[in-house]
Design a protein with these regions (language model features):
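The beta1-alpha1 cofactor-binding region of Rossmann-like NAD(H)/NADP(H)-dependent oxidoreductases
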Residues: 40-41, 61-72, 106, 143
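Catalytic loop of short-chain dehydrogenase/reductase
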Residues: 141-165, 171, 175-179, 192-195, ...
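Active-site loop of short-chain dehydrogenase/reductase
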Residues: 6-7, 56, 83-84, 131-145, ...
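Conserved glycine-rich Rossmann-like NAD(P)H-binding loop of the short-chain dehydrogenase/reductase
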Residues: 29-46
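SDR active-site lid
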Residues: 179-261
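Canonical Rossmann dinucleotide-binding motif of NAD(H)/NADP(H)-dependent dehydrogenases/reductases
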Residues: 2-34
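Substrate-binding pocket helix/loop in short-chain dehydrogenase/reductase
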Residues: 98-101, 105-110
Length: 294
């Protein structure tokens, strides 16, 4: 798909991190950008920054786990600009779950699924029919993760399960768009190949009351800085991928019509091969990993 001025891109989770980097990159291509996020103050700041740089911007406070909120976002985008050409279902959270799976609070799962899975589905339902009906080339990018999207991560099982669901959902979306003969493409994004400095580690700041934890955490929430310090203390250097690099990967992938937005990585390739071989061999999953601090 060719990206050009006059087109409109919608990005959820756009107030910071990967989402804001994608919005900046689309704006640099001359696209109008619609920013959606649950954090109102950060959203206003992001929109003001882009507008000051000359971008055409619409910002809306949105809870992607609420279908009506996402439908209202679509209505606002189409009312303001008449069409949407790129949709990035990017909003995501960590669950805050502790301990073994059978010890998790149901609300940890409900909240993570509300944002990471239902949020993507709500975006698809709200925008894709209109994008198809418009007849112009378009593209949908759904953000997954190597943690779950490539192979399970048992020590972050809730998050990993949601990101695995995003991969399968996007594969199904791709097939449905092809069967429809639509001019709209689909991709699944695996940000990386290294760690990213985003607000994911502090997701609990946005946890809604309806999904509140039923009991206090046994340990405090850990920050990315604390994780990095613990890794260094254990003798492991943590590598980071700039969010701008992820945004560039997205733009390149849209232009190429690439389904798997998966950056080159020997580690990812090993995980893909190991998991596939385990299935072919009907063998136990010896490839499962754990992270320090989990």
């Amino acid at each position: 798909m060719r990206l050009a001025p006059g087109q409109t891109a919608v990005v959820t989770g756009a107030a910071g991190g990967i989402g804001l980097a994608m919005a900046r990159r689309f704006a640099a291509e001359g696209l109008t950008v619609v920013l959606a996020d649950v954090e109102e103050a950060a959203l206003r700041k992001a929109a003001a920054e882009l507008a000051a740089d000359g971008a055409r911007v619409l910002a809306r406070t949105v809870d992607v786990g609420d279908r009506d909120s996402v439908l209202a976002l679509a209505d606002a985008a189409y009312e303001a600009f008449g069409a949407v050409h790129v949709l990035c279902n990017n909003a995501g959270v960590g669950s805050g779950a502790e301990g073994r799976m059978w010890e998790h609070e149901p609300n940890d799962w409900k909240w993570a699924f509300s944002v990471n899975v239902w949020g993507v589905f709500h975006g698809i339902q709200a925008f894709v029919p209109r994008m198809i009906a418009g007849g112009a080339p378009g593209h949908v990018v759904n953000t997954s993760s190597a943690d779950g999207g490539i192979a399970p991560l048992p020590t972050a099982s809730v998050y990993a399960v949601t990101k695995a669901a995003v991969v399968t959902m996007t594969e199904s979306l791709y097939a449905h768009l092809k069967a429809e003969g639509a001019a709209v493409g689909a991709s699944v994004l695996f940000p990386g190949p290294h760690m990213l400095r985003t607000g994911l580690w502090e997701s609990h700041r946005n946890r809604p009351e309806r999904y509140a934890k039923e009991r206090p955490r046994r340990t405090p929430y850990r920050s990315l800085d604390q994780y990095e310090a613990a890794m260094k203390q254990a003798g492991h250097e943590v590598n980071f991928t700039p969010v701008e690099e992820v945004a560039e990967h997205v733009v390149d992938g849209i232009r190429a019509g690439r389904f798997w937005m998966l950056p080159p990585s020997e580690h990812s390739d090993r995980q893909i091969r190991a998991r596939s071989q385990s299935m072919l061999d009907r063998a136990d999953p010896a490839y499962l990993e754990s992270f320090i601090l989990d």
